[in-house]
């Protein structure tokens, strides 16, 4: 394999304390190939929401697989899930399905371009929306014209966004954002999403919400409902099926014709096992306090980290959203100190990432938080001593 290990977050680039391969997982714990156990605060980079191997989800998948999975035509589970998502999401009238977050966000860009007849994409500076050329135009192998089709503004800066519309409004197809800042986790400033919505309406552009990472950790109807956003298109993946491969794109009625015109397909898009997993996941979310529990656990974790950092004089920056905290230190531009700290935390039994937001799940317990805070306390003490 190129580089030995590949992926959007190469494990080989992490600190010495991090494992390179994992053998199994259960609830909120993971075990590496050497048998070491960790509390997992990455949740498979987001897809794990209810716990690894959740019995209700896995039972639904097993029942579906007994009847068939990837077939030449879709099954009834696809229709059931589309109807369910539309019923749960106040600003959605239709749904389509893919496999990865990039499927959903790229579909949204295509729909917006088809609807408006325009080429330009606007996003917040530093945001990541897909491992696709339109989102990562500066990477090797990507033609230069992709860079010319992407405009950026600073998160929460309506003046800069307004200036982009003033200069390029007739060519802007879509503004795509996450529900909070991708880099810092900072939430929207008062009036930000209302202003963004008004600019899109004034200039005839589409507002797409990339809810791939955050979806279902804040609100059953989409993170926009929690943060006060009113998008035209919504993109889900990761947690929607508790670890089974699925993505969804939801849209408002005025964009239905454009959605009918774009070409959106894939070899495994009809696989019904993932639809069954998503339906079961939504059942659990509706029937329990899972989302509220995620928020409570995230606050307990991040409050504990903040108290420890203060006690040891380590300058912990604001973590953003407790359910998806961004752990960073001030005066650490090359991330050396945070990498050292995360390696120590991981060695202590809690899997911690130095360059990606963490994720909290409904499976994390008070015991998991306590075990983690024991590891982080020791790590803070060490990095404070090392300076």
Show the residue positions of the predicted features.
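Conserved N-terminal phosphate-binding loop of PLP-dependent enzymes in the Aspartate aminotransferase
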Residues: 1-387
């Amino acid at each position: 394999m190129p580089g030995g290990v590949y992926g959007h977050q190469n494990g080989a680039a992490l600190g010495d304390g991090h494992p390179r391969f994992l053998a199994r997982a259960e609830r909120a714990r993971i075990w590496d190939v050497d048998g070491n156990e960790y509390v997992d605060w990455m949740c498979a980079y987001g897809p794990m929401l209810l716990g690894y191997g959740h019995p209700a989800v896995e039972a639904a998948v097993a029942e579906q697989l007994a009847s068939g999975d990837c077939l030449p035509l879709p099954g009834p589970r696809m229709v059931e899930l589309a109807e369910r998502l539309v019923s749960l999401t106040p600003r959605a009238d239709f749904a389509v399905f893919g496999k990865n977050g990039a499927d959903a966000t790229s579909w949204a860009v295509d729909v917006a371009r088809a609807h408006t007849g325009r080429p330009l994409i606007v996003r917040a500076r530093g945001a990541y929306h897909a491992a696709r050329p339109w989102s990562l135009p500066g990477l090797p192998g990507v033609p230069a014209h992709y860079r010319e089709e992407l405009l950026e503004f600073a998160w929460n800066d309506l003046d800069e966004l307004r200036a982009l519309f003033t200069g390029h409004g007739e060519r802007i197809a879509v503004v795509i954002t996450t529900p909070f800042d991708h880099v810092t986790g900072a939430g929207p400033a008062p009036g930000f999403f209302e202003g963004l919505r008004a600019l899109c309406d004034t200039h005839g552009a589409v507002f797409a919400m990339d809810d791939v990472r955050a979806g279902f950790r804040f609100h059953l109807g989409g993170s926009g409902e929690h943060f006060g956003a009113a998008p035209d298109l919504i993109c889900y993946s990761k947690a929607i099926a508790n670890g089974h491969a699925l993505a969804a794109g939801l849209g408002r009625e005025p964009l239905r014709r454009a959605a009918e015109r774009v070409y959106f397909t894939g070899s495994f898009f009809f696989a019904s096992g993932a639809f069954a997993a998503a339906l079961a996941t939504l059942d659990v979310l509706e029937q329990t306090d899972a989302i509220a529990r995620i928020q409570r656990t995230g606050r307990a974790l991040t409050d504990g980290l903040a108290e420890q950092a203060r006690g040891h004089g380590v300058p912990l920056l604001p973590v953003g959203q407790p359910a998806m905290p961004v752990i960073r230190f001030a005066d650490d531009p090359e991330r050396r100190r945070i990498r050292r700290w995360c390696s120590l935390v991981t060695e202590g039994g809690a899997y911690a990432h130095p360059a990606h937001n963490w994720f909290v799940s409904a499976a994390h317990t008070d015991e998991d938080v306590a075990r983690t805070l024991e590891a982080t306390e020791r790590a803070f003490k060490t990095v404070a001593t090392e300076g």
